[in-house]
Amino acid sequence: HNAVADARPADHRPDGGCAEKKKKKWGVTMSEEKTIYTITSDRNERVFIHAMPGHFVSSSSHLNFYIGTSDIKHNHDISVDAAMMLASYYHERGIEIDTVLCLYETQALGAYLAHELQRANMLNPNPDSTVYVLGPEYDAQGNIIFRDNLRKLITGKRVLLLISCITSGKTIERAMESVSYYGGETVGISAVFSAINEVDGVEVNKIFSADDVPGYQAYPPHDCPLCKGSQKVDAITNG
């Protein structure tokens, strides 16, 4: 997600009165311009996202929160911690990964994730495989394509899709279609934040969910209460 939002009332409470229950996970930064909530992970307090209330538009949904994941994507220390959290999911389940396909500026996080996936663990004490990291290229229609020299990293490979945020899953579905088209198999989906639990039968391995952002809602574009209430759009976001 990349967005800039206008001001929201400083006393806006996105949790509908549930702030006390979530107190240990919420931090609040308020200024004249905006209110930003910092949400930390239960598993590692150094890993966090930001949530900003408002009216935001993605490619498939209207949202009442903007989820900021920049620190996890671009801060080295936080990225490493987040990668360890995401990798543990695959270690615990014995899921082997050949290629990490990074969507929406997650290449740095993807590199750390690949490093963690290659490390020895209890289920695989002597790993001998290489995990590749790949960023997508798009054609004029927005489909993911792979040049001849990179197709070998997808064809016949077990692919992990990495993305910052998932709202409806449409972006991941398109990526899965591209992986399948080039002869690969999507065996894992990892996200910093996801509002859904699975896409086309593949469970989403996520650090944060919609439950971590009390009051979070994603609406169909044709049935958005924010639009019906004439609330202006603050920004357009990815995902």
Language-model regions: role of each:
Residues 1, 11-12:
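Intrinsic-disorder-associated, low-complexity terminal segments enriched in Asp/Asn/His/Tyr and depleted
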Residues 107-160, 167-170, 221:
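Short, glycine/charge-rich flexible loops or terminal/linker lids adjacent to PRPP-binding catalytic cores
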Residues 102, 161-162:
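Hydrophobic Val/Ile/Leu positions in short beta-strands of Rossmann-like dinucleotide-binding domains
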Residues 26-96, 239:
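Active-site-facing substrate-recognition patch
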Residues 95-106:
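Short glycine-rich phosphate-binding loop at a beta-alpha junction
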Residues 26, 31-40, 174-239:
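PRPP-dependent phosphoribosyltransferase catalytic core
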Residues 21-25:
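Polybasic, lysine-rich low-complexity intrinsically disordered segments
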